[in-house]
Amino acid sequence: MPHSVSRRTTGSTRLLPADTNQARGLADYARDFLLHPQPVGARTLGLLERFHVDSVGCGVSALARGANAPTVLRREALASAPAVGSRGAMCFGARRPVAIEKGVAADAAAVREWDSNGTNFGHDAAKGRTAGEFGHNDFYPVALAAAREAGLDGDQTLRVMLLIDEIRGRLAEVFPLRAYAIDHVHHGAVASAAACAAALGGDVDAIESAIGMVVAHYVPYRAIRAGHQLSDSKGASAALSAEVAVSAARRSLAGFIGPKDIFRNPLALYRRNVPCPDGQSPFDLELGLSGDAFAIHSMHFKLGLYEHQSAGALQALVDLFARCPGLAADPDGIRRVEVAIYEPAFSIIADPAKRTPTTRQSADHSLPYILARTLLKARATATAGGAALAGGTTPGWNELMLLPDDYDAERIADPGIAALIGKMAIIHGGPEYDARYPDGIPTSVTIDHAAFGRLESGLVCYPLGHARSDQAATETLVDLKFDRLVAGAVDDPAALASRVRLAGKSVEDVAELYAFPIHGCDPG
């Protein structure tokens, strides 16, 4: 079982106190971060590159397989043209530029469609900022579009990406949007508006205006995540928020004046939901400037397609297969599976409606389905044996990696899935589990098996992929995931990975970074 790995991050930060105009402070910070850069640590930049490459693999796979939302939004983008005087944005796999906001929406939707890119849980224990809001690195297309428009090179573009991840990551540590039924992508929209406006040369007034417009006009609610079966709106939420963030940035640069001092506005979402005295917002906001003092070091990788709060249960299964080698080959002998998890995971992925998913969007957010599919995949691997086991004797993350085919209509309807789900009980682990989130993903799995008796995983907190897990093992699996996702979509997965790494790339390289062919995808 992976153990916690402690990593110290050092570097300078900037504090924006609650009793200041934090929107203007963010604007100053964004401009300074891009225009007066301090050295960023090699570990931070390397991690950022890996998260970006991983996101590209997710996006390319979704488009190559004709996933609905990104295909619809890409088609819409390809029907648009850049505004007069604009260089436009490039959609994945296209050969001509489109309207910036449309291209950003299409690319962000593709990146997010599989729900397999990087994840953060808003946690900085050292500073006592543990709001635990979710977030994902869905917004890199904003940085690419701004870079193309502004003529930035690869190293400058990486800073725009890091700026977006830093702002949304630090907001996630101090303000839990989910507690007020607001979708987590809103933090990314605020970050995107600030970073885009700054990258395009906006002054402090314009950047503050863009932030104010996003907060005042474009707040997405978690209605997109309610109901028995999830829709395209769930997967495209970040894309639509990125679209309006870019529009707000460009509109502000054109002279539109949005609300000022929005974080202390008594009727904006922050003080409206967390009342506090006039002249204050509900939180201090501290942002990294240099070294490795960035929120990205608390971001996690997904080692396949699954809602990330399932990762602890998946690691528990991998541990049980290693501990009881006969288990993988005999899921039919399972009499009961009990999974103990924490809040908010219990409410999100153990919702009773998730026991009978009929769409991929619901299945990949269904803990029972994810576990059932993994058990069936383990049996197939164990039965095949030999070369099917990558150097081991029992199936591990390599063999059990959940991919798009694991969520197709045939597998969702597999009677074996329903049979296993019928044996599962998902319970709330109680205060002991809740207290360990968001530092970890506390989960335990207990299996009652006809042949092997009672099998207990013990408490899993840091599954592979988690920021505090074994990073070397995680990196190997992330690279493997990329290769598997883009296989069949491009001629040479390794060449694609090299192409989209940004360090040292020229302005011309960055402008055409996503303009590579994708098999089966309209080049426009």
Please state what every model-predicted region is.
Residues G85-G88, L144, G151-L152:
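Carboxylate/His-rich catalytic cores and anion/metal-binding grooves
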Residues H136-L144, G188-A195, A242-S247, S310-L314, ...:
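Well-ordered alpha-helical segments within folded domains of soluble proteins
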Residues E49-R50, K127-Y140, E149-L158, D183, ...:
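Conserved, well-structured ligand/cofactor-binding cores
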Residues A147-E243, S247, D261, P266:
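Glycine-rich, mobile lid/loop segments that gate access to catalytic sites or pores
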Residues L47-F51, D138, Q156, V160, ...:
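Residue-level detector of well-ordered alpha-helical segments, enriched
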